[in-house]
Regions:
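Envelope-exposed proteins and targeting segments
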Residues: 10, 85-88, 137-139, 149
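Mid-domain, small-residue-enriched loop/turn segments at the edges of structured enzyme/sensor domains
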Residues: 23-27, 31, 43-94
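Solvent-exposed loop/turn segments at secondary-structure junctions
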Residues: 19-20, 40-42, 65-66, 73-83, ...
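Structural recognition of the beta-strand scaffold that forms the well-ordered cores
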Residues: 33-35, 42-45, 66-68, 142, ...
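Active-site SXXK
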Residues: 1-13, 34, 153
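Acidic helix-start/capping segments at beta-turn-to-alpha-helix junctions
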Residues: 11-24, 33
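Structured C-terminal helix/loop/strand segments within mature extracytoplasmic catalytic/sensor domains
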Residues: 48-51, 94-183
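Surface-exposed patches in mature extracellular/periplasmic domains of secreted proteins
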Residues: 8-14, 46-47, 67-73, 100-108
Length: 183
């Protein structure tokens, strides 16, 4: 959004007609639908429109992990060497929440809208790591605003027997419920 590739009002990217591994990916996508379903082709299209140098500069600017993007033409989130810890993700999310990066307010509002997950006011993003067509890792990073303050959470799960972003989200929700932060 900061580069004008999409805007808060105009962020639909047309589906290219390719058969993707998840039915929810096989349609036109908005920022919200792409974030909700982790639609890699949408995010890759944004990266390609920006160009690899600009994308890498952006992630370096915000300090996204070790910024080891490799040469993956399918997008750095599809198996590159980028490494970021749960703590680093929370620190990055806090900076984004406070808008320490100086992004336009409407860009921040559009991203917040795209990652709103439930009626408890929990915002976040899930991710699933796959190896040989098996889900082996799940993560969730998010925040919730309450009368007592804003709480940030990150959960990373790894299991050869199966783990995914939905399980990490459920785990994070249960932690927040156990701490009486959400109902």
């Amino acid at each position: 959004m900061e580069q004008g590739i999409i805007t808060p009002e105009a962020n639909t990217i047309a589906w290219d007609g390719a058969a993707y591994p998840f039915e929810s990916w096989n349609r036109d996508q908005t920022l919200r639908s792409a974030m909700q379903a982790s639609v890699n082709w949408y995010l890759n299209a944004l990266d390609q429109s920006a160009g690899s140098a600009q994308t890498e500069d952006f992630f370096s600017k915000i300090g996204y992990g070790d910024c080891n993007f490799g040469n993956d033409s399918d997008g750095f989130w599809n198996g590159s060497g980028v490494k970021i810890s749960a703590l680093e993700q929370v620190e990055l999310l806090v900076k984004l929440y406070r808008n320490d990066f100086g992004f336009r307010d409407e860009s921040i509002a559009a991203v917040r809208d795209a990652i709103l997950l439930d009626e408890d006011g929990l915002y976040g993003k899930t991710g699933t790591g796959r190896l040989n067509d098996t889900n082996i890792a799940g993560w969730f990073i998010g925040f919730v605003e309450t009368h007592q303050g804003t709480y940030f959470v990150a959960v990373y799960l790894h299991s050869q027997n199966g783990s995914d972003g939905a399980l990490a989200y459920e785990t994070a929700s249960n932690i927040l419920k156990d701490m009486n932060i959400i109902e």
